[in-house]
């Protein structure tokens, strides 16, 4: 083999590992830049309390609450758009209510959005307990939710805190959008709209009504 060819070959072998390293670094930098690019879009967060409950609590809905839940499967998509994601408070949390303060699994929020989830063909995320407001607020800030409609059914005792924490996470400053959610209010819907541009959100907040008060107190009849 001529000297020049051998020299070229040695030079090539010498620089080949360096070329691989440089190429890998370039690809890593590009991939990291693409991955870190914030997702723009409009995020519509629809917050509602669970439906009506029986006098004894039972962690459960009563027949009027069941009727509301069924009606919500029509009302929510019509008024606020079809959900991409649905959350409900984890039913494994126990509540003490009724005579003797007996402990019951807290299924009310899940049952309230259950018909909507079934109708829309969606799962319900129950990873967060009713008092896990900070954790859920952090979850809702993820890029995957930045251009979506989200229904969240929760406990009225924690809804003001949850809504304020979401607003605080999105805006970066303290927020108090809802002072209180009264014990007799099953009809309110709080909608927080976040418009995301380059990782920053502008916030809009409105209080709506479902228009489902005074619903029938008898359970639906089977056909």
Model-predicted segments: where are they?
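Periplasmic-binding protein-like
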Residues: 149-153
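Hydrophobic alpha-helical membrane-insertion segments, chiefly the h-region
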Residues: 21-31
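Active-site-proximal alpha-helix that buttresses catalytic centers in soluble enzyme cores
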Residues: 34-147, 158-223
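N-terminal Sec-pathway targeting helices
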Residues: 4-19
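Compositionally biased, intrinsically disordered low-complexity regions
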Residues: 7-10, 28, 195-198
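Short, intrinsically disordered low-complexity segments
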Residues: 5-9, 31-32, 65-67
């Amino acid at each position: 083999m001529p000297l020049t060819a051998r020299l070229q070959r040695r030079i090539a072998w010498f620089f080949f590992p360096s070329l691989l390293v440089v190429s890998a670094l370039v690809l890593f930098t590009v991939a990291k830049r693409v991955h870190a690019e914030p997702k723009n879009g409009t995020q519509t967060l629809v917050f509602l309390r669970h439906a009506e409950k029986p006098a004894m609590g039972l962690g459960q809905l009563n027949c009027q609450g069941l009727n509301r839940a069924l009606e919500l499967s029509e009302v929510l998509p019509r008024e606020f758009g079809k959900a991409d994601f649905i959350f409900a408070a984890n039913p494994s949390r126990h509540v003490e209510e009724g005579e003797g303060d007996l402990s019951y699994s807290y299924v009310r929020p899940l049952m309230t959005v259950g018909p909507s989830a079934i109708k829309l063909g969606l799962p319900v995320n129950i990873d967060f307990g009713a008092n896990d407001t900070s954790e859920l607020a952090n979850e809702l800030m993820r890029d995957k939710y930045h251009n979506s409609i989200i229904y969240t059914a929760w406990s009225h005792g924690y809804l003001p805190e949850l809504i304020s924490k979401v607003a605080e996470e999105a805006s970066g400053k303290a927020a108090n959008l809802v002072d209180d959610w009264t014990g007799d209010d099953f009809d309110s819907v709080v909608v927080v709209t976040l418009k995301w541009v380059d990782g920053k959100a502008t916030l809009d907040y409105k209080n709506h009504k479902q228009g489902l008060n005074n619903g029938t107190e008898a359970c639906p009849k089977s056909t």
